[in-house]
Amino acid sequence: MSVVILDFGSQFTRLIARRLRELGAYSVILPGTASLERIAQENPQGIVLSGGPSSVYDANAPRPAPGVLDLDVPILGVCYGMQFLAHEAGGAVQRAGKREYGKADLTRYGGQLFAGIQGEFVAWMSHSDSVTQLPQGYEVIAATEDTPVAGIENTVTRRYGVQFHPEVVHTPKGGQLLANFLEICGVARDWNAEHIVDELIEDVRRQVGAGRVLLAISGGVDSSTLGLLLARAIGDRLTAVFIDHGLLRLGEREQVEAALRPLGVNLVTVDASEEFLGALAGVSDPEQKRKIIGREFIRAFEREARKYGPFDFLAQGTLYPDVIESAGGEGAANIKSHHNVGGLPEDLAFKLVEPFRTLFKDEVREIARLLGLPDAIRMRHPFPGPGLAIRCLGEVTREKLDILKRVDDIFISGLREFGLYDGCSQALAVLTPIQSVGVMGDERTYSYTAALRAVTTDDFMTAEWARLPYEFLATMSNRIVNQVHEINRVVYDITGKPPATIEWE
């Protein structure tokens, strides 16, 4: 049983799925044109038609497959989805006299979708078309000053629509509205971490049988959690390989070992730093660095696979957003290969096991909590596959990495100490190749400049630079130049994404 979300191109479609899951209902995203047969495979108890950039009156406007609107389940249309419901039922949709973008107050609201909601209702609008004539059987259930039809319902056919985005945080009571839709659908709201873990373990055991599984551990939350889940499901038939390429943060290898081994993960750690740093010698171009690191990882991983094999399966931490991004027109997914293991030779062509392919990142973090993964790893900020190589601008050397590791450790430890870490989506230190004149005591210095960066974001597609307190930044600068003598200048990056990327390389 699920709620199927048909995606017509809205940037917020994933948020709809996440909000419904947070409310305890399993939800699945399919292309807006998914066939009736494909939708039926999900056994839907409700359907959501997402927003999108198209206009329903255009000849090439996307539309659900024939028969979808005839299904005997409640349907909620959001923005474009509402306009489509109205248009298909005989109503009129036209270019709005005044476009609405941003927050708007509902001047009135009611009906089944708004049951139990009281007080001011702020909604996030983003539309240039409006329903100008209601189809037969529908009633207006919401309006704003500029949009007289901001919500519609037909309680007989159980068709509902809103001309705003209930899934975004800018619609504070949107969660209550979505919960009301789930009540209308009669969905069993039993989708929770405990339920997920039990199902995943059974699925793994069923798929793997008596086979052996190989997993690459990066030290991040996804692969670490996957290691714990697989260890619980199949025990020592899992071999997890952690490649230390010398580009990790200070103490990271020891932290991963201390977190996973006591919890039963059969973990193999490999020090391949000499190979990686040797291959990176003299290389300054960031794209070249990435390619070299990817190549060396494959070599090291292949060597360990042959050493501890044979294996029947390769486990990957593919997440649901990866599946959505690579889905074809009928929802068939060609899953992206994990950046670390996508180039293995054909004779190591394992079958894939991807237990997290239907999960979002926040669901994986909750599973990690249940499985006992320490918060230091579970709530860790994202860390790039190439590691510190792309935060050490220019050529990568052991000496420069040692400097960067100490700067990064001071910054990240400081964020935790001051209670600022969890308020940032990602924080990092960069060692620049810039050297400048300074004064330490009575002596002239000519040392490196370190850059600190912290951002806040919901999706990492765009990001704001974090407004960290001046006192904190002053403290970090003071600690860094006093404890890392190779640094005599610290700068803070105040550039958003765009125009910059989060990482410097």
From Swiss-Prot:
Pathway assigned in UniProt: Purine metabolism; GMP biosynthesis; GMP from XMP (L-Gln route): step 1/1
EC number(s) recorded for this UniProt protein: 6.3.5.2
InterPro entries cross-referenced by the UniProt entry: Class_I_gatase-like, GATASE, GMP_synth_C, GMP_synth_GATase, GMP_synthase, GMPS_ATP_PPase_dom, NAD/GMP_synthase, Rossmann-like_a/b/a_fold
Keyword Nucleotide-binding: yes
Signal peptide limits: none
Binding-site residues, ATP: 218-224
UniProt-listed PANTHER family: GMP SYNTHASE [GLUTAMINE-HYDROLYZING], GMP SYNTHASE-RELATED
Protein name in UniProt: GMP synthase [glutamine-hydrolyzing]
Organism per entry: Deinococcus geothermalis (strain DSM 11300 / CIP 105573 / AG-3a)
Lineage start: Bacteria, Thermotogati, Deinococcota, Deinococci, Deinococcales
Gene name, Swiss-Prot/TrEMBL: guaA
